Amino acid sequence: MSQEFDYIIVGAGSAGNTLATRLTEDEGVTVLLLEAGGPDYRFDFRTQMPAALAFPLQGRRYNWAYETDPEPHMDGRRMECGRGKGLGGSSLINGMCYIRGNAMDYDGWAKLPGLEDWSYLDCLPYFRKAETRDIGPNDYHGGDGPVSVTTPKAGNNPLFHAMVEAGVQAGYPRTEDLNGYQQEGFGPMDRTVTPNGRRASTARGYLDVAKKRSTLTIVTHALTDKVLFEGKRAVGVRYLVGAAEERVEARARKEVIVCSGAIASPQLLQRSGVGPAKLLESLDIPVVHDLPGVGENLQDHLELYLQYACTQPVSLYPSLLWYNQPAIGAEWLFNGTGIGASNQFEAGGFIRTRPEFEWPNIQYHFLPVAINYNGSNGVKEHGFQAHMGSMRSPSRGRVQVKSKDPRQHPSILFNYMATEQDWQEFRDGIRLTREIMQQPALDAFRGREISPGIEVQTDEQLDKFIREHAETAFHPSCSCKMGTDDMAVVDGEGRVHGMQGLRVVDASIMPIITTGNLNAPTIMMAEKIADKIRGRQPLPRSKAPYYVAGDAPVKGKAMRDVSAVAQ
């Protein structure tokens, strides 16, 4: 069985759905969109209810459920590496936090050779193009894009406001928009949720429009085996369909675009013969092109939870009790409101821990309940927590294919906490978080410190806690990086070096991870590269001003000084 299309896109995730939608806007352009997972079933509360975000991570219907190799600096733990499987990709199972990154991230990219048009003001128009924000457009936000963005509303949980106020009382800035003029500071957090309280995945925002077009063919339960080449040109793919794993070949007249994410994109390239020659030869994979950077430069965000008991009955603890959940579900299902309609990450912030950081190196998510991100180990009392993680770790990992079998997961090593900077940032972060949590704004709510526990104080004690309890923020990236150096995999338009008709477009092509969550940047990158593929002029550069810290102090004087950081 053989088919022919203009473009074949491998992976119907945050980038793939964006590209499929934009490419088929052009009359007569045909696209085959392949997805290894299934549909995004709209009646499955596990993926559609924002508050149920932990459920998809607990199974394998929507989650690839990768695990790392034993991490050498984390007591040899095999750590979670959840990735979305199904229409929407990781936007189908993520935490729905709409965070774009810091303007300085993109200005940093633009200083790299070949990436001059990736500055913040070049990228901002594409963030706006993708977005519809519920309170309307402005210089930073869009009003008619496919991605529904919801802002926190009056009357939400008082713990959100208390935690932001505590951050301000600790001496940090207040910001009204973490995606606007100034990311640095504490404030409300936007989320990818529709006006009627449903998850705004790219399957909903983009594919709901595009799938009506006869020029778009979507095949689910299609596991791509390899990219097919004639010489150095990609001419198609071979994929396995359904439980019977029927082998199908499809031809691409113009391009094969790999949008499989930071784990599966390098895995597919390597399995197809594009990657480090020594690795491929060791697995008897014929080398099509020796490209040493494929799978290297892997980055992620690591985070910790600092948990506190709540002395007032205002946390979300009752919503964890089974007998309260039917009413929560009914309100969400019929009205699109209530606890179920929010991801419950409605406040957060970004800070610098030391003057040598030019822009924030720590991110906070505040949550009005004490529980692990994947829904495990819920504290059986009222509580709240701060998720705290470093943003631009110098540690680098890698992804390596283990066989020719597309069903076998690759070898993944993030090499977390490999540098002294990592340890210093986390120690500082824990101590500064404790200072924030001791501010007067939280006096009415703050009980005992549940985790790490007030007895954990010395560097050695903190390091032990970090090794045992730090978790992924589910932000793998940078494993097929853009650039021109010897380890770059693609150019600034996603074209694979040394090949023709082959691109990679997803979080793997980031050269350096951004400051915050990765879904919004991934969609932006796909929007920007879509214009390149279509031969369109780039959107005009934005003229919006943005904050640069410069010589500004890291923080002001705390309202309540608790000698947070040991010098």
UniProtKB/Swiss-Prot annotation:
NCBIfam families: betA, PRK02106.1
Similarity comment: family membership: Belongs to the GMC oxidoreductase family.
The organism of origin for this protein: Pseudomonas fluorescens (strain Pf0-1)
Domain of life the protein comes from: Bacteria
Annotated active site: 475
Involved pathway(s): Amine and polyamine biosynthesis; betaine biosynthesis via choline pathway; betaine aldehyde from choline (cytochrome c reductase route): step 1/1
InterPro entries for the chain: BetA, FAD/NAD-bd_sf, GMC_OxRdtase, GMC_OxRdtase_N, GMC_OxRtase_C
Listed HAMAP family: Choline_dehydrogen
Protein name in the entry: Oxygen-dependent choline dehydrogenase
One Pfam short name: GMC_oxred_N
Cofactor: FAD
Alphabetical keyword list: FAD, Flavoprotein, NAD, Oxidoreductase
Binding site for FAD: 6-35
Record lineage: Bacteria, Pseudomonadati, Pseudomonadota, Gammaproteobacteria, Pseudomonadales
PANTHER family in the record: CHOLINE DEHYDROGENASE, MITOCHONDRIAL, GLUCOSE-METHANOL-CHOLINE GMC OXIDOREDUCTASE
Function, in words: Involved in the biosynthesis of the osmoprotectant glycine betaine. Catalyzes the oxidation of choline to betaine aldehyde and betaine aldehyde to glycine betaine at the same rate.
GO molecular function, one term: betaine-aldehyde dehydrogenase (NAD+) activity
One record GO biological process: glycine betaine biosynthetic process from choline
EC number: 1.1.99.1, 1.2.1.8
GO cellular component: membrane
